[in-house]
Amino acid sequence: MWWGGFVLLLDAVKGLTPTFIAMKYASANLPETSQMHLPVAAGICAIIGHMYPVYLKLRGGKGVATALGVVVVLAPQAVGAAFVCFLLTVAATRMVALASMIAATVFGVTELWWLGADATKPQFLSLTAFAIGIPVLIIWRHRSNIARMLKGTEPAVTRSVAPSESDAVDDAESGSN
């Protein structure tokens, strides 16, 4: 199970790193009215590169963890709401794909709410487009999961618990080694 957490961390860092570097560069070298565009572009490139890697014949991941890394830099205020919705959805449905799509949507809605009237100002248009486009793209990448959910065949998350000593004794007594 810890491998999954490790991969999640690496994918998040894959999005966080270029976005963070672009944010630092932009804040030091670009006019305030265009500082957000470079980190948004870097984040989009990281997400698209994860979803459609050339070296894997354009067959990559769904982009959720990479988007998380990008969002931590671009819109940290929206991460909490998306994360809570992710956890609640997994707890209620045991479906990570559904939780990922809901969290992406909650991020977009939360970020647009946070931007408010500023969402249409030129310096925030790239962030507005990101808040709308990335959740749509993440949902698009989950098409096969959506089809399985509709058929009732989407796998649920299960807890893997190490067998207790009493389970081992029961197995030995029943002859199921």
Predicted regions and their residues:
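Anionic-ligand binding patches
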Residues: 17, 24, 39-59, 64-73, ...
